[in-house]
Amino acid sequence: MENEPDTICILVDADACPVKAEIYRVAERHNLPVVIVANSFIAIPREAQRVERVVVSGNLDAADDWIAEHSRPGAVVVTADIPLASHALEKGASVIAPNGRIHTQSTIGNTLATRNLMDSLRSAGEVTGGPAPFAPKDRSAFLSALDLAIVRLKRAGFHAS
């Protein structure tokens, strides 16, 4: 992964990410490096350019820990994991969920509190189920959010390497 402080890169929490193909296409269009981080081997299409695979081992949060450690201004982190999103924002990264939700410093506190509350309710048997199934509108929202994040970073002085 290119680690120049003024370059844009995309870090992907890849184990359950439903938008990897979209990330590859957008990254190729903008000539950006992508780092796919997972707890197990993830296939990368042969035609995907500038994609690095990082397979971490160890605990369940090893991929999240790796991404948090490598988050920085100029990085776009793609994750559905709210605690990871919070850590990445603390490091100055831009954060997008696979459904297109853009996390910011001003929204992550409420999002984290809601996640923790729902976790507690599920543990107590009060709430069952999880998030809604991934839908085509989520894919579209994600593509828009990723393009917006890249444009904002370029306007802020970051560039493709």
Swiss-Prot record:
Q: Where is the signal peptide?
A: none
The protein's matches in Pfam families, at most eight in alphabetical order, are given as: DUF188 (PF02639)
User: Where does the chain cross the membrane?
Assistant: none
Origin superkingdom: Bacteria
List the InterPro entries hit by this protein, alphabetically. Answer: UPF0178
Q: Which family does it belong to?
A: Belongs to the UPF0178 family.
Task: Quote the protein name from its UniProt record.
Answer: UPF0178 protein BAB1_1980
Taxonomic path? Bacteria, Pseudomonadati, Pseudomonadota, Alphaproteobacteria, Hyphomicrobiales
